[in-house]
């Protein structure tokens, strides 16, 4: 509403307050159906009201019913009534904020991407993954979780396409479907009273609102994330998730994923845009009033807990110890497994995707109670984009669609879901094909037809040669935190005894010795002493002598935060090296 209209409203309100109060309902002078109160525009054609409360009240957010200012709205008012107040009107600029957010645009700036980081990226356009591959050709299905009313962003949409109720009424969110005309909204046949209740009962987003989409990402409940499923809507098991359970903390998603101006912090390693560039993408466990000081290096011991975690927090993410498994199955029938492999050559029942048996979902392998893979992550990712040249990862033998960046000296050890897929790629230029998932899932069900449609959508000829390849992805695990009494055992990373003849889990992460055992150990030992066979005894080297022996005496890693002796520092190294010096590379 313009300032002129608001001023007119306030002036009219002052006049109304000066008039004597008469019994009975006011006359509906403008015939708009609102007569519970004197309407803003009953005697002023230059302004309008959105409900019988009137939009020109001195305290607009209170309305005539302070507990529910939307109580007199009806379904026909949606979204016009919302826009009149929330698009630069008396209630704020929420439409403008939401319209520009990643939740609506599905693309955004990508400061955390090493692959074409200066470009706009997102699921609306160029994102490719090992699930539904790419959205090209499949807006009717993939777009059903878009925060809009049906129109694809950039194709004639406007702020009126923003679907407020998707996040602000959980009953509406559960009943929201793709309608025959392509729009999104309540299913046909929904009772008028139910429709009216959607616009009359507006609330902050609940877990149900968020999970209606996020739990079903990738094509089904719990399919994509491994740590997010519909079970979190009403979970009461602390061991399933200590934060999101109705018998415990009962946190809402936005308690951690803080929103400002409809932009949110926090995203997975495989997601490209950063919604709020100023605040960044990371949710920290010790922010605000939660777990204060636990990342300080002394917080665990100070709180009366074990002290070992304190020496890990600088290099190990909280999730690595506090989420020992994902896709949990604790005997509750609502808990669901997660997808670990997908093969587009076959339908879900194992039959060939040749169109004979009709449309259907691709074949998937789903598992529960999975142990994460661990990688060092520095918050940067290399995520495949449409038309990128595919390059095999020599460590896995597969084409990656998402890789967390970092190494033993750069980043924190973080738990990941590792997942594979079989999907098509062009032969000549080795680019992953955006198989037309709508053709596959809702059309013929023929993989060849879906590939040909995808090729055409990408600008290739329909007969462009293709091949089947294996892809893989890493996805950070962040939800499903266990109670503090049930953290991962040290053996999840540290084997019970040392075996220097083969690579351990930690060796594979960069902790292997920097040279042959005999040469590394000979710096300090003459061979007469047996090698410690346990991790804790080996770790005691950092407590030796005046300063402690630095990690890079034996490994190609540095832990400067511990202030240990560096082998290149002659002022302290002589205290430890008393046998055969190792040829360390010193600057």
Per-region residue spans from a language model:
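Sequence context of c-type cytochrome heme-c attachment sites
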Residues: 55-206, 212-286, 292-309, 414-420, ...
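Extracellular calcium-associated, cysteine-rich motifs in secreted modular proteins
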Residues: 24-62
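Repeat-solenoid scaffold signature
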Residues: 281, 286, 290-402
């Amino acid at each position: 509403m313009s300032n002129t209209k608001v001023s007119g409203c306030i002036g009219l309100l002052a006049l109304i307050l000066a008039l004597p109060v008469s019994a009975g309902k006011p006359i509906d002078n403008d015939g708009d159906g609102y007569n519970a109160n004197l309407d803003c525009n009953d005697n002023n054609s230059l302004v309008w009201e959105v409900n019988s409360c009137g939009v020109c009240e001195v305290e607009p957010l209170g309305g005539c019913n302070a507990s529910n200012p939307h109580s007199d709205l009806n379904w026909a008012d949606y979204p016009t009534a919302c826009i009149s107040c929330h698009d630069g009107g008396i209630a704020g600029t929420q439409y403008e904020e939401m319209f520009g957010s990643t939740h609506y645009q599905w693309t955004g700036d990508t400061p955390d991407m090493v692959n074409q980081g200066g470009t706009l990226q997102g699921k609306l356009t160029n994102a490719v993954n090992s699930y539904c591959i790419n959205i090209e050709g499949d807006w009717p299905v993939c777009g059903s979780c878009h925060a809009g009313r049906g129109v694809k962003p950039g194709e004639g949409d406007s702020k009126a396409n923003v679907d407020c109720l998707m996040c602000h009424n959980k009953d509406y969110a559960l009943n929201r479907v793709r309608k025959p005309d392509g729009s999104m909204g309540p299913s046909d046949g929904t009772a008028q009273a139910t429709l009216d209740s959607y616009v009359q009962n507006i609330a902050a987003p609940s877990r149900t609102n968020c999970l209606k989409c996020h739990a079903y990402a990738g094509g089904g409940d719990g399919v994509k994330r491994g740590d997010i499923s519909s079970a979190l809507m009403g979970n009461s098991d602390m061991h399933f998730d200590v934060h999101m359970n109705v018998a415990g903390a009962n946190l809402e998603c936005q308690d951690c994923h803080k929103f400002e101006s409809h932009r949110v912090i926090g995203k997975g390693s495989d997601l490209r845009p950063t919604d709020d560039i100023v605040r960044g993408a990371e949710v920290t466990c010790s922010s605000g009033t939660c777990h204060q000081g636990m990342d300080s290096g002394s917080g665990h011991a100070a709180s009366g807990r074990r002290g070992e975690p304190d020496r890990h927090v600088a290099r190990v993410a909280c999730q690595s110890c506090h989420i020992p498994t994902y896709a949990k199955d604790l005997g509750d029938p609502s808990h669901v497994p997660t997808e670990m492999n997908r093969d587009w050559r076959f339908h879900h029942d194992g039959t060939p995707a040749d169109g004979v048996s009709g449309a259907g979902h691709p074949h998937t392998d789903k598992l529960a109670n999975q142990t994460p893979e661990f990688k060092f992550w520095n918050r940067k990712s290399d995520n495949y984009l449409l038309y990128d040249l595919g390059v095999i990862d020599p460590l896995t033998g597969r084409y990656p669609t998402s890789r967390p960046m970092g190494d033993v000296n750069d980043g924190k050890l973080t738990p990941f879901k590792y997942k594979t897929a079989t999907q098509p790629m062009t032969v000549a230029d080795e680019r992953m094909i955006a198989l037309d998932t709508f053709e596959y899932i809702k059309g013929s069900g023929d993989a060849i037809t879906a590939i040909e449609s995808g090729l055409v959508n990408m600008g290739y000829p329909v007969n462009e040669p293709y091949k089947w390849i294996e892809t893989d992805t890493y996805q950070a695990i962040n939800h499903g935190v266990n109670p503090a009494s049930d953290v991962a055992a040290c053996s999840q990373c540290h084997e019970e005894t040392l075996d220097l003849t083969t690579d351990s889990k930690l060796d594979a992460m960069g902790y292997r010795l920097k040279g042959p055992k005999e040469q590394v150990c000979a710096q300090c030992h003459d061979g007469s002493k047996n090698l410690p066979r346990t991790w804790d005894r080996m770790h005691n080297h950092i407590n030796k002598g005046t300063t402690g022996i630095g990690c890079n005496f034996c490994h190609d890693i540095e832990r400067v935060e511990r202030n240990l002796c560096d082998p290149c520092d002659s002022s302290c190294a002589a205290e430890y090296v008393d046998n055969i010096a190792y040829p360390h590379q010193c600057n």
